[in-house]
Amino acid sequence: NVDLIKLMITGGVLDAKAKGVPGELKMKPEMVKAVCDKAHALGYNVAAHVESPEGVRVALENGVDSIEHGAKPDDEIIHLFKENNAFLCTTLSPALPYALFDRSVSNASEVEQYNGNIVFEGIKECAKAAIANNIPVVLGNDVGCPWITQYDFWRELYYFHKYVGVSNAFALYTATLNSAVMAGIGNVTGSVEAGKCADLIVTKNNPLDDLRALRNVDLVMARGRLYNNPKFKTKNIVTKELDKFCLLYTSPSPRD
């Protein structure tokens, strides 16, 4: 069954042919509007991959419900977010390796690293502006991109705290309940409440004190079924390189 429509309104880092032009517009505005109108008529929300200010503007002007990634916003873009009650899905994980890894590790070209920095900074600035303007933000990690795995989503929460400057509590809320609300299932899951699905994880240490506690999961409860001490395959090179950006930690953030 279809749950959501996703558009690729812009390109990204890997298909940009020159420095300074990541997120080139790939869909005409009238095409975006036609898809959104049809999807909404059928009861579906529309998300859009967007990595340039022009792409964000085209998406929001033509009915997109959530922006995946984002780009540095101006006042007009902030207004469009609010006018459309749109969400922002912040995804620092896919941009970080291209922006911050040594190119001998990432195998990125000089152009890809340059544009990776533009996208990484744009995602950060979009998230900060959205939070400052009470625009709802959720988290994603764009799994399937290089250096992104299925088993360590906790890193996205950590990056959100480290690079956007939110509290640990806000990062947890953004990744759970707010994300469930965006997906249209906030009445079913996303928080521990009577009447909702028993979906939660248990960790030995408290992620409110240090989000890296989420790395070691002792128990998963999914729709009431228990999975004790879950095990999964990992990629050592991925862990080694990504851990370099998760080891420098200041004092625990306030529990607000």
Residue spans of the language-model regions?
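Divalent metal-coordination and catalytic microenvironments
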Residues: N1, I5, A39, I67, ...
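Active-site core of metal-dependent hydrolases
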Residues: M8-E125, V138, G144, G165, ...
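His/Asp/Glu-enriched, well-ordered alpha-helical/loop segment
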Residues: A41, N45, S106-V111, F120-N206
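Short alpha-helical
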Residues: P53-E54, R155, D209
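C-terminal cap of metal-dependent C-N hydrolases
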Residues: A175-L177, A194-K240
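Conserved small/polar residues in nucleotide/adenosyl-binding loops
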Residues: Y249-D256
